[in-house]
Amino acid sequence: GFIGELERFFALISEPKFHPSKELIDKLNYLSTLGHEPPLVAIVGQFSSGKSSFLNALLGSDILPTGVVPVTAKPTFIKYAPNYMLKILHNDGRDEYKNIDELSAFVDQRHALKDVKNLTIYAPNEILKKISFIDTPGLNSRSDADTYETKMILKEAVALIWISLIDNAARKSELDELNAIPNDLRQNAIALLNQKDKLSDEDIARVLTHANTTYSTHFSSVAAI
């Protein structure tokens, strides 16, 4: 079929005799997955904005641990598989697989995360058959390497959901991070202002008006949840 022919073509022009650049090889590898992988939606937001809780609610299952220590200290893919599983990609390219029950304990070990590039959580969730998610540590991480990794991953995403605490929405502290969102992703990006139950209806309307003005060049729509 077409996908098979495409993969054979990619394999051919990736051969050393064609002197392909690493950037080209990475792009070809990404394109070759498009026939198999569901589209990737990025979940982005500042620390403790409720990204993991939002994803759990969306998926109807507590797949991601929540609490003080964020699982998204590293980029975390959430993908479909028949069984729960955790894959750890180390900086040296080595894959390590663990039982999903070990996830919380693993992310509590900050020293262990230093050698990790990203995590993938596999789950037998029907939504994940159609959409994969990437829960990111944000674009203002203390680690330049983590920020770079997030930016590279965003290039693979087809849509983006920004999660912001409603009482902290559209403040200057967010704008530098928002400016790092790729321009071609902004038309498929939305902002969700989390924990609207903290505010009165009048305050929600005021915040939404301010956010729509501030976010106008970054998101196609803004909503309070």
Question: What do these predicted ranges mean?
Answer:
Residues 1-19:
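Charged, amphipathic alpha-helical linker segments immediately N-terminal to NTP-binding catalytic cores
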Residues 17-24, 146:
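Residue-level recognition of alpha-helical structural elements
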Residues 22-34, 38-39:
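Pre-Walker A adenine-sensing motif
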Residues 35-225:
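Globular "head" domains of long coiled-coil molecular machines
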Residues 6-9, 24-28, 103, 107, ...:
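Generic structural signal of hydrophobic/aromatic residues within well-ordered alpha-helices
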